[in-house]
Amino acid sequence: MAETKDAAQMLVTFKDVAVTFTREEWRQLDLAQRTLYREVMLETCGLLVSLGHRVPKPELVHLLEHGQELWIVKRGLSHATCAGDRAQVHTREPTTYPPVLSERAFLRGSLTLESSTSSDSRLGRARDEEGLLEMQKGKVTPETDLHKETHLGKVSLEGEGLGTDDGLHSRALQEWLSADVLHECDSQQPGKDALIHAGTNPYKCKQCGKGFNRKWYLVRHQRVHTGMKPYECNACGKAFSQSSTLIRHYLIHTGEKPYKCLECGKAFKRRSYLMQHHPIHTGEKPYECSQCRKAFTHRSTFIRHNRTHTGEKPFECKECEKAFSNRAHLIQHYIIHTGEKPYDCMACGKAFRCSSELIQHQRIHTGEKPYECTQCGKAFHRSTYLIQHSVIHTGEMPYKCIECGKAFKRRSHLLQHQRVHT
């Protein structure tokens, strides 16, 4: 029974994690948005392969790698039943199916497309061996029509170099070629597909009103409201609402960091993290605050900074309802309620609630004092100690007794004094 459950959890297809655009939607995206889309889709492909899943459609991966236009590839049915009308695979150049798509290439963070040594130009034998899906080389012209007749359950392949020999009818290859990756027209409901082709979102969420162009997207979205998490990690039991999130989570257990920076050699678990890291070397800071003109390398940092101006605190503690502007601060705060101290000092065994406290404590053992007074040169291992010390030079006495008005340089001195009145 457990084996059946595990098997069901591993049934992740590219359809589950693909995000698609119509031609009109694609044209509305700017260069940065298109690049981000390609990076995320390629990362998803790589993670699926690294977990032993079948390689997604080769023509899509080829387009992603070579930066060609990526609007929806629709498969029509007939002139009478579908507004899509036998839509074709749009490319500017003839698309070459990559014959060998290796798992190792994905894990390096880039795809290596190796040419087949076979002289046979048809798309032929398919075999899944040692994690590699090996395909013979085949070409499709821009006018090639991959027309799937869903109501008959038949695949019709037309175009240069595509034969119908028995090698083409391997079950694995048929499933691979005919996978419902982007959109499949329904002969029984042509009106529904006409809406999808028109760029409308007929499937509405009753909870929040958000619209989707496919029922499956609506079903997946509804898990946000229901809290349903059908994808469970076999290693730790943690559950997720989407298969793509489970795949990314799995790298935590493997410890794998397949995306390496060519500049400094630093490795990352996700391609998106590598892309965020890259501006450190270029010095680029594209995100500028309109309030104070401060610029940021990453969008996430810019969003966090912007909350200092708006006062927004979207992260609320469920225990005491205290709100925070930063998710990390909420996580640190939550430990107050649990009493957990997960950060242990290797030198003395003392435990701390957050990593910053551990770092400060470790300076006692190392003798490091990074905070130096510009007036006298005295150094401290905590910034708060430097702030307290600087009052000596300024003569400031910010801590005043409410009872008698006497002022003190330090808060601790004020607390000692207040005992006189009690």
UniProtKB/Swiss-Prot annotation:
InterPro entries: GLI_C2H2-zinc-finger, KRAB, KRAB_dom_sf, Znf_C2H2_sf, Znf_C2H2_type. A zinc finger (C2H2-type) spans 203-225, 231-253, 259-281, 287-309, 315-337, 343-365, 371-393, 399-421. SMART domains: KRAB (SM00349), ZnF_C2H2 (SM00355). GO terms for cellular component: nucleus. Residues 113-158 are annotated as: Disordered. SUPFAM superfamilies: beta-beta-alpha zinc fingers (SSF57667), KRAB domain (Kruppel-associated box) (SSF109640). One of its GO terms (molecular function) is DNA-binding transcription factor activity, RNA polymerase II-specific. Coiled coil: none annotated. Its main location: nucleus. The keyword Nucleotide-binding does not apply. It comes from the Eukaryota. Residues 122-152 have a biased composition (Basic and acidic residues). One of its GO terms (biological process) is positive regulation of transcription by RNA polymerase II. Keywords: DNA-binding, Metal-binding, Nucleus, Repeat, Transcription, Transcription regulation, Zinc, Zinc-finger. Residues 12-83 form the KRAB domain. It is found in: Nucleus. The keyword Cytoplasm does not apply. May be involved in transcriptional regulation. Belongs to the krueppel C2H2-type zinc-finger protein family. This is Zinc finger protein 550.
